[in-house]
């Protein structure tokens, strides 16, 4: 929603936003079940107005080849990729390519558990070890990219949302 709003305000005019991994499916759930969203979003979706989850700025990463193309791009891009703890998933490929470059930034939007690569990065690790399938093992990767943490984002429900959901369940 934040990125879609920035785009609609002209702040991300020519910056593509790629969704890689289960993020695409999770975003689709918001459109499929708008009754769990706030009134403003729900009404936009029900009235076929500007559904922020289906904005033209979002591009699905369809293949490993497409991911490699994105990793090799020279122009700015935003990539939302799983896994949140930086212990697997598509984010590892982006990290391998972009960590050494100081003109890249990784933004953490969630909690990083103890012992995870994500936590080590947040704590300022200047080198991490990642699996390299070409070399068949772990290789050191220098971390020169910028690292930021943006609190307040979560893919999980808060207590109020969980309680509201529980009230709707009807046992069989």
PLM features per residue range, with description:
Residues 1-172:
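Acidic/His-rich, metal-assisted hydrolase cores and their charged scaffolds
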